[in-house]
Amino acid sequence: MHFIGRKQELEALEVAFRGAAHSPSRMTVVTGRRRVGKTTLIRESTKDKPSVTWFMTAATEKDLVARLTQATVSALGSIVPEGLTTFAGLFEALMIYARHHHFSLVMDEFQNLAKVNSGLFARIQDIWDSNKDQTHMHLILCGSSYSMMKKIFEDNREPLFGRATTKIHLQPFAADKLISLVEQAPVKISNDDLLALYSITGGVALYVADFVDNGIFHKEQMFEWTVRPGSLFLSEGYDLLRLEVEAGQSTYISILRALAHGQTQAPRIA
């Protein structure tokens, strides 16, 4: 599926990038539910600009730094001093590079840094505050766990509270955007088909793309595609719950399973 919409969000990212050309650096936080298109939006925004993307995974800090160093060298060249093994050291190296270079640094799934080293947010804050006024970096911090990202950037007890200069909360596509998309479909689509598309996907970008990219445009096809073995929809509820709720997952899953089996009385659900 080709890139559609997001005009306001692209403009906000463009303004932040242009602003970083002149000190100080800019920090943009991009949030939104899983599958809504955050990474695609950022990729579209940075595709013709100097940039490096770091994908954060739950790994040892040493292994993560080794992988992020490779990504940095591939994107920007050999700008990282040899022997770096800490995330703070790598981030500081890029801030130093940003004193004389204008570029974007994207940290995707940023909340996962807490699983690597819980003290990294404080180190990022310290390095950012010490260097942002003399540098030209557009730092884009993106995450799918809304609860975690909200805590990191909106809890006044957290190190990165108040640091973002731009905040983008990406929403699913509205119905009018889906209409403009399906108008380009190779087959005629009825209002019932459009209603089914919006009802099933909620306008979530990846779900819409799953139908469009596979030529699924009619409601009967959509229903069959959604429940077929291997459908991405079958595990989405569990995956979303696991992403947002770390403690007590089994309890919530048991409650949902009981409801799905028709239980309506509290003693039976519990």
List each language-model region with its residue ranges.
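Phosphate-binding site recognition
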Residues: 1-270
